[in-house]
């Protein structure tokens, strides 16, 4: 019985140690929000969304990608309808690889003519 308790304590301690290592990984979020021009068609906006999603498979330094439509009831969105969150392991990945990557440059050229307003916020994840 004494050995079983010792084994459980050791297993629990190892599990907590592994959990702490996971949460200590530094991550950076790149949040991009768009207000599209009224003249942009639904088809154009849908193509832009698909192109942004495709960056995840084209740029290996993107660790995670999420997006969604504004559903806030607060009416403080200033016309912003789309929000995208891109996760990087480092600022070097974001600034040195992603920003100048040909797929990202192509995406910016695609979206540019359709956007009335862009808001970008980057932050280091604090747990």
In which residue ranges do the predicted regions lie?
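Alpha-helical and His/Cys-centered functional microenvironments
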Residues: 12, 34, 108
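Short, structurally constrained coil/turn elements
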Residues: 12, 58-61, 114
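Generic structural motif recognizing short loop/turn segments at the entrances and edges of beta-strands
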Residues: 12, 24, 116-119
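Sec-dependent N-terminal signal peptides
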Residues: 4-12
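Generic detector of short, well-ordered, non-transmembrane alpha-helical segments enriched
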Residues: 14-15, 100
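Surface-exposed, polar helix/loop patches in the mature regions of secreted/periplasmic/lumenal proteins
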Residues: 83-127
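Short S/T/G/P-rich N-terminal loop/turn motif that feeds into the first structured element of a domain
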Residues: 3, 17-81, 89-96, 123-127
């Amino acid at each position: 019985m004494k050995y079983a308790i010792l084994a459980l304590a050791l297993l629990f301690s190892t599990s907590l140690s592994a959990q702490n290592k996971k949460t200590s990984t530094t991550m950076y979020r790149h949040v991009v929000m768009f207000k599209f021009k009224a003249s942009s068609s639904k088809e154009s906006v849908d193509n832009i969304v698909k192109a942004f999603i495709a960056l995840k498979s084209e740029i290996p330094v993107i660790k995670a990608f999420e997006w969604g439509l504004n559903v806030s009831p607060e009416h403080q969105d200033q016309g912003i309808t789309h929000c995208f969150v891109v996760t990087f392991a480092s600022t070097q990945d974001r600034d040195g690889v992603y920003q100048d990557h040909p797929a990202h440059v192509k995406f910016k050229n695609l979206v540019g003519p359709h956007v009335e307003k862009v808001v970008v916020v980057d932050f280091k994840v604090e747990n």
